[in-house]
């Protein structure tokens, strides 16, 4: 798949962050978990009741979404319609479900 222009990637990343925000809100509501979501540009911060955070941001030069969680730092690259971890091949939403569940202390899943 050919690389996108920077503006194409930023538009794609913004749409994906919108999807992630909606998915986290829906999963948190379903699990009755308190997760504060804030966004500044292409940086999203999820803050949990225990004070821990997950940061998700886009990296246009690398054409990746980066996730920083208690579990570590992860880079996801677009593969068709999915975002895949560049190290272990895991899918973004499956990975986020695990990171968010761990930090929220409740089982949350989203797609």
Curated annotation (Swiss-Prot):
GO terms for cellular component: cytosol. GO terms for biological process: iron-sulfur cluster assembly. The keyword Cell inner membrane does not apply. The keyword Metal-binding applies. Coiled coil: none annotated. Keywords: Iron, Metal-binding. GO terms for molecular function: ferric iron binding; ferrous iron binding. InterPro entries: CyaY, Frataxin/CyaY, Frataxin/CyaY_sf, Frataxin_CS. NCBIfam families: FeS_CyaY (TIGR03421). Involved in iron-sulfur (Fe-S) cluster assembly. May act as a regulator of Fe-S biogenesis. HAMAP family: CyaY. Belongs to the frataxin family. This is Iron-sulfur cluster assembly protein CyaY.
């Amino acid at each position: 798949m050919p690389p996108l222009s920077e503006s194409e990637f930023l538009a794609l990343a913004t749409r994906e962050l919108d999807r992630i925000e909606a998915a986290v809100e829906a999963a948190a509501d379903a699990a009755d978990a308190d997760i504060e979501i804030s966004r500044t540009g292409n940086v999203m911060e999820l803050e949990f009741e225990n004070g821990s955070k997950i940061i998700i941001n886009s990296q246009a030069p690398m054409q990746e979404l980066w996730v920083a969680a208690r579990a570590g730092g992860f880079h996801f690259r677009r593969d068709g319609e999915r975002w895949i971890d560049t190290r272990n091949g895991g899918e973004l939403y499956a990975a986020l479900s695990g990171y968010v569940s761990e930090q929220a202390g409740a089982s949350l899943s989203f797609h």
